UniProtKB/Swiss-Prot annotation:
Residues 112-122 have a biased composition (Basic residues). One of its GO terms (cellular component) is nucleus. It comes from Arabidopsis thaliana. GO terms for biological process: plant organ development. CDD domains: homeodomain. This is WUSCHEL-related homeobox 7. The keyword Amino-acid biosynthesis does not apply.
């Protein structure tokens, strides 16, 4: 506990295999078990992107068998996973676009054209 009354949490205190539960030090962050991650990933790969409130509750009840979990953990897992997938797609499409620009030799790039032009006579 700090002098201001805030609880200071060290990283790694929740590295147990029961999803952050247990009798050890209390941790404010959910640490999913391998089984929980596998089930969530399988649902995501099957096409579930934005589960409804009912679906979230059913999923969290199912996942609670493998360790401590709350509905908000499921909600945020899907939100984060969807955002990371979008980010990855954007990064891949940007790389493909840049690569296509670098390998397209049929049209000279603007900066190359300017560099090789003769100075204007005046």
């Amino acid at each position: 506990m700090s002098s201001r009354g805030f609880n200071i949490k060290a990283r790694g205190l929740c590295n147990n295999n029961n999803g952050g539960g247990g009798t050890g030090a209390k941790c404010g962050r959910w640490n999913p078990t391998v089984e929980q991650v596998k089930l969530l990933t399988d649902l995501f790969k099957a096409g579930l992107r934005t589960p409804s409130t009912d679906q979230i509750q059913k999923i969290s009840m199912e996942l609670s068998f493998y360790g401590k979990i709350e509905s908000k953990n499921v909600f945020y897992w899907f939100q984060n996973h969807k955002a990371r997938e979008r980010q990855k797609c954007r990064k891949i499409s940007t790389v493909k676009f840049d690569h296509r620009q670098d390998t397209d030799l049929s049209k000279p790039r603007r900066d190359n054209v300017r560099r090789h032009q003769l100075p204007a006579k005046g």
